[in-house]
A protein has these predicted regions:
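Short alpha-helical DNA-recognition segment
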Residues: 15-33
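The alpha-helix within a helix-turn-helix
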Residues: 11, 22, 50
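A short, Lys/Arg-rich alpha-helix, primarily the initiator
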Residues: 1-17
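Short, basic-rich loop-to-helix N-cap that marks the start of a DNA-contacting helix
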Residues: 38-51
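Residues within the helices of the helix-turn-helix
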Residues: 8, 19, 33, 47, ...
Length: 71
């Protein structure tokens, strides 16, 4: 699973709010909602975030293996 917990930390460090992403960079509330819920986000959106925040993908996203269950 890809999680975006680091995104919110990086945004805070860079002084970028969700409101600013919506107002100045035309992010939709749906895009932000998917990020909050660790949902599907396309690579274009991730690229935009890296450009806006001047950061690497590892500063906004992290891969965490799904827990395997025995069937």
């Amino acid at each position: 699973m890809i999680v975006y917990d680091k995104l919110w930390v990086t945004m805070k460090e860079k002084g970028i709010t969700q409101y600013k992403l919506m107002k100045d960079y035309h992010f939709s509330s749906g895009q932000l909602d998917r990020l909050r819920k660790n949902g599907n986000v396309n690579t274009y959106t991730l690229n935009q975030l890296c450009e806006i925040l001047n950061c690497d993908i590892s500063d906004i996203a992290e891969y965490i293996p799904d827990k395997k269950t025995d069937a």
